[in-house]
């Protein structure tokens, strides 16, 4: 499978014309060449040329922000629930993951602070993808401490916060208006179009839901479109020709396009 992906990447230059309007490629969970959402994935993503990388954000029982897509660590070989575990507990686990034909192992949990440090060192813009911190989405108590961490690391100028929760958006716009935001609209993009464009929010939409009319409407409203997940040259070509502004990918590294 990895050989097939490599062949597709090499062929992509023949399928896609490179120009000034090329989308920003975002390394999904770092990149697809290490255990997802770990320091190794972020270092490898930066090495492969990503100028923006995504990290999913959750909070531990002792209020440390960590990078993890799932609320539990079992998919990566752990056995803990992040919200019920301390950072010290989570540090005791070692993670592994099979991605296509390769198996990656030996990684441990990464904190958001560490992710931001890597981004700052490598000159990469961080995309912090918030997972829901509480069943009550009006409980926004974690958001100001997260913004405080972003400021502490000196990354407020380049960091983007992505969330599907309108309550989080409203809170952040009211309390931290300088922080850049994206709204994850997906299948709700038409339903939420007026709400998001009235706030000048860039949007993220799943790739199969994006067509020319979708991109045109958002661009006419003066906002940008981010699509996920784009892992083939054909899909890259289709979406690039539509004029999308960002693409989230595991494998389509900028150095290969």
Residue ranges and their predicted role:
Residues 1-23:
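Bacterial Sec-dependent N-terminal signal peptides
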Residues 17-257:
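Phosphate-group recognition and catalysis centered on beta-loop-alpha active-site segments
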């Amino acid at each position: 499978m990895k050989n097939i992906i490599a062949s597709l990447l090499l062929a992509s230059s023949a399928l896609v014309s490179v120009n000034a309007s090329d989308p920003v490629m975002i390394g999904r969970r770092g990149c697809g060449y290490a255990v997802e959402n770990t320091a190794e994935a972020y270092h490898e993503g930066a090495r492969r040329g990503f100028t923006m990388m995504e990290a999913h954000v959750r909070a531990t029982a002792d209020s440390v922000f960590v990078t993890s897509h799932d609320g539990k660590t079992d998919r990566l070989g752990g056995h803990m629930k992040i919200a019920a575990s301390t950072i010290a507990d989570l540090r005791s686990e070692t993670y592994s993951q099979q991605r296509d034909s390769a198996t990656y192992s030996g990684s441990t949990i990464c904190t958001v602070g560490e992710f931001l440090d890597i981004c700052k060192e490598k000159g990469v813009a961080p995309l912090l993808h918030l997972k829901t911190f509480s069943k009550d989405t009006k409980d926004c108590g974690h958001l100001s401490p997260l913004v405080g961490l972003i400021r502490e690391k000196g990354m407020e100028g380049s960091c983007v916060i992505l969330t599907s929760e309108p309550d989080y958006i409203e809170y952040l716009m009211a309390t931290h208006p300088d922080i850049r935001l994206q709204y994850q609209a997906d299948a709700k993009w038409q339903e939420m179009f007026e709400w998001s464009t009235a706030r000048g929010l860039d949007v993220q939409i799943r790739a199969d839901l994006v067509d020319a009319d979708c991109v045109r409407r958002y661009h006419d409203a003066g906002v940008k479109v981010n699509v996920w997940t784009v892992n083939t040259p054909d899909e890259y070509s289709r979406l690039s020709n539509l004029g999308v502004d960002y693409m989230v990918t595991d494998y389509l590294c900028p150095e290969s396009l």
